[in-house]
């Protein structure tokens, strides 16, 4: 199975960002990390193995773009002013929209995009998908926190 690591300096964020690409074809799946997780956690947790998502990746049904985050600089940056945290989240959204989506389309022309995440990644998947319905066809949120201010769990 194809595994590739990519890193570039993000103009939207003003810093280097990393991601991991798994698979060779299929629906493009944006995989958001859990709370303070990383781009490698889905492979670290063997989600790409047979019996989990391995067959889907091997058969070209999905291609996963495992993303990194800016949690400490946004919602988890409790030392920051709330407005600064919200602004950083919007910059992350711009990074996804203006950099990750075009990058993934350059790797794989399949127009079908799925945003998926677990825990705080589910919040990011839902947020990005709902904010960009013209770019995202499906959202899968697993055990996510959807109301950060009220800390309500769904």
How should these model regions be labeled?
Residues 1-153:
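Non-catalytic cap/lid and distal C-terminal segments of serine-dependent acyl enzymes
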